[in-house]
């Protein structure tokens, strides 16, 4: 009859068997690598003003020590000029970095707007990578979706175990 749905009913993992995995995306590592990549640009920009050296800093933060602290104001301006505009989902613009200075040291961190934009980009890329790797295996009807701010839910029918699923995805998605 026409009133009956024509599509097939998708059986869940409980009825069909398969693997369920909740993967966490390491966003803090992305922030840290962004700051790592910022160092050569900052160093080269400040080199003509005064010699600089990198100082130990928490992950996701870059600290640069000026050899000549009297040039702090100029150094801060040069560093702020390295900032790029950020366009977020809301369309609000802002700078990608926060720059501050004290006692001859410049501290650079990612702005909240850049962290939000980076989170979105990283999660989208991670979802695409996981989806592509699972599709390569030819599994039918996998569920791959974002869950919360930094997690990806992966459910694949027909796969024997979570270990097998991890092997398909790989350790660095």
Map each language-model feature to its residues.
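A structural signal for conserved, well-ordered secondary-structure elements
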Residues: 1-173
């Amino acid at each position: 009859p026409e009133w009956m749905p024509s599509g097939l009913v998708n059986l869940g993992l409980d009825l069909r068997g398969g693997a369920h995995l909740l993967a966490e995306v390491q966003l803090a590592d992305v922030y840290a690598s962004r700051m790592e990549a910022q160092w050569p640009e900052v160093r080269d920009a400040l080199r003509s003003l005064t010699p600089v050296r990198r100082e130990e800093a928490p992950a996701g933060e870059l600290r640069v020590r000026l050899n000549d602290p009297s040039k702090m104001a100029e150094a801060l301006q040069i560093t702020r000029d390295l900032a790029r505009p950020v366009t977020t989902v809301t369309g609000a613009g802002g700078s990608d970095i926060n720059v501050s200075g004290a006692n001859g040291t410049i501290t650079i961190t990612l702005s909240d707007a850049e962290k939000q934009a980076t989170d979105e980009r990283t999660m989208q890329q991670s979802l695409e990578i996981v989806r592509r790797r699972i599709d390569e295996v030819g599994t039918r009807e996998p569920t791959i979706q974002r869950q919360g701010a930094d997690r990806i839910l992966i459910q694949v029918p027909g796969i024997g175990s979570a270990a097998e699923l991890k092997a398909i995805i790989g350790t660095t998605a």
